[in-house]
């Protein structure tokens, strides 16, 4: 499942109400975006039971960086939602009583964008994250040149330049 997430055309959003440990923390880190309740906590706590969290170390390390990830992995200590936001494990922290509404608002904001651009942009993003910097820029430059040729991009740019209402996206 973790390997499938980057290849899905739709963004995958984690919604974290309370505690995400070990594989739960791994899933949060593997998702494209994550919205956490202000009450949420996160840990790779396997080490406290004698098992280093090997598979969680992959997406957690790629999201929060090696020093922070190793601190979490070596100690098993929990971090709070604000620390998870600061460290890049989650993309938003919201009050607990607004978690459902704010997560849905994020999903709706994404769904209101051109679907083909979201899908191809997500694929390009995940691909360039595995590349060297110069290769990533080359990929992104080619992507932008191709994206500018789509009907949605042309309609969106025209609407912006000519101060027209946002167009209905066609996915083309």
Model-derived features with residue positions:
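Crotonase-fold acyl-CoA enzyme core
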Residues: 3-118, 150, 155
């Amino acid at each position: 499942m973790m390997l499938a997430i980057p290849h899905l055309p739709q963004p995958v959003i984690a919604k974290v109400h309370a505690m995400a440990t070990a594989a739960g923390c791994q899933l949060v880190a593997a998702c494209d975006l994550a919205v956490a309740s202000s009450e949420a906590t996160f840990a790779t706590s396997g080490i406290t039971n004698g098992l280093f969290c090997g598979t969680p170390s992959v997406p957690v390390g790629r999201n929060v960086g090696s020093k922070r990830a190793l601190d979490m992995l070596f100690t098993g200590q929990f971090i709070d939602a604000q620390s998870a936001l600061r460290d890049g494990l989650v993309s938003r922290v919201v009050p607990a009583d607004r978690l459902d509404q704010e997560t849905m608002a994020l999903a709706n904001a994404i769904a209101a964008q051109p679907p083909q651009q979201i899908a191809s942009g997500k694929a390009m993003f995940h691909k360039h994250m595995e590349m060297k910097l110069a290769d990533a820029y080359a990929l992104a430059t080619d992507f932008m040149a191709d994206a500018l040729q789509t009907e949605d991009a042309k309609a969106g740019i025209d609407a912006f330049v000519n101060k027209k209402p946002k167009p209905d996206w066609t996915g083309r």
